[in-house]
Amino acid sequence: MKPYLLLTPGPLTTSETVKETMMTDWCTWDEDYNLHIVEALRKELVGIATRNTEEYTSVLLQGSGTYCVEAVIGAAIGKNDKLLICSNGAYGDRMGNIAEYYHIDYELLAFDETEQVSVDYVDDYLSNNSDVTHVAFVHCETTTGILNPLKELAHVVKMHGKKLIVDAMSSFGGIPMDVSELGIDFLISSANKCIQGVPGFGFIIARRSELVRCKGVARSLSLDIYDQWETMEKGHGKWRFTSPTHVVRAFKQALTELIEEGGVEARHRRYCENHRVLVEGMRSLGFVTLLDDAIQSPIITSFLYPKTGFDFKAFYTALKSKGFVIYPGKISKADTFRIGNIGDVHPEDFARLVEVVRETEY
């Protein structure tokens, strides 16, 4: 099969060295794995998330990022709590679906998919609804690529004394942030996003005191984040159930490569440059971005169809034949396609993509 670059928001293109680490088998009971890989990366994750490493901890969970979102909602929201979900896309809406399944008391504030979650609206809602105990939203909503105002929203949530859950699936490791400074209680992300690992597990960066409060609350055995965390703490990296060993080892390598690149700030600069080269090039060909530049993330970029009758499938196939895989659109109000800027991809790759698009019939 002809190799290609995944210009998608995860799974994404990984380095050869990340792939190579999966060629070795690991024993889930061995210290070489649990202590030197799992425990080491748990500490590294907290170090990436905050300078306040004593107050925060991390827990890893098998499955996709959504498993972790469901696990947090199912364990952090008690029977007498109320969750406010602020949504401007499919992944915020999914939080509502999870709350519905668990019969959790919640309210969903729905915003337009091409507009940020309104800080003023959230502030007003919390001022008039004192029964809310937790607030959740998506930082980078990959439905469109929109970046919600994390700092401002976090400030409002903490000003009202609420617990904060942030889905940072597609931003953690690629956009600088400090969970302690922001007052985040639970941050959720996944191995196959900005850290540039492969799919197979997600992780939660949690305030220790809030994670302890999850004891006995979880509505699912396999998604019990307190029990998973306690097992890892006492077992020095041991997982309750079968660990995705190859994926974990690849993630450890990906973390090493993040540090070698210069950390989150350096990776963010590369993603921003990828985005700049892509957008400038596509605009020169007549393509129009869905979002205003001011609210656009450097993670994934949505473009409007260039004309009526545009055949996305043919366009997709043509690009794939030249070594690039892109994403279809995910919103109902406009015909779009999406191009991811994250992964082991660089500005020269996007310059080459633009030339391929220039030569493509569409």
UniProtKB/Swiss-Prot annotation:
It catalyses: (2-aminoethyl)phosphonate + pyruvate = phosphonoacetaldehyde + L-alanine. The modification N6-(pyridoxal phosphate)lysine is found at residue 193. GO terms for molecular function: 2-aminoethylphosphonate-pyruvate transaminase activity. Pfam families: Aminotran_5. Gene3D superfamilies: Aspartate Aminotransferase, domain 1 (3.90.1150.10), Type I PLP-dependent aspartate aminotransferase-like (Major domain) (3.40.640.10). Coiled coil: none annotated. InterPro entries: Aminotrans_V_dom, NH2EtPonate_pyrv_transaminase, PyrdxlP-dep_Trfase, PyrdxlP-dep_Trfase_major, PyrdxlP-dep_Trfase_small, SP_NH2Trfase/AEP_transaminase. One of its GO terms (biological process) is organic phosphonate catabolic process. Its cofactor is pyridoxal 5'-phosphate. It is an enzyme of class 2 (transferase). Keywords: Aminotransferase, Pyridoxal phosphate, Pyruvate, Transferase. Its EC number is 2.6.1.37. Belongs to the class-V pyridoxal-phosphate-dependent aminotransferase family. PhnW subfamily. Homodimer. NCBIfam families: PhnW-AepZ (TIGR03301), PRK13479.1 (NF010006), transamin_PhnW (TIGR02326). Involved in phosphonate degradation. This is 2-aminoethylphosphonate--pyruvate transaminase. It comes from Bacteroides fragilis (strain YCH46).
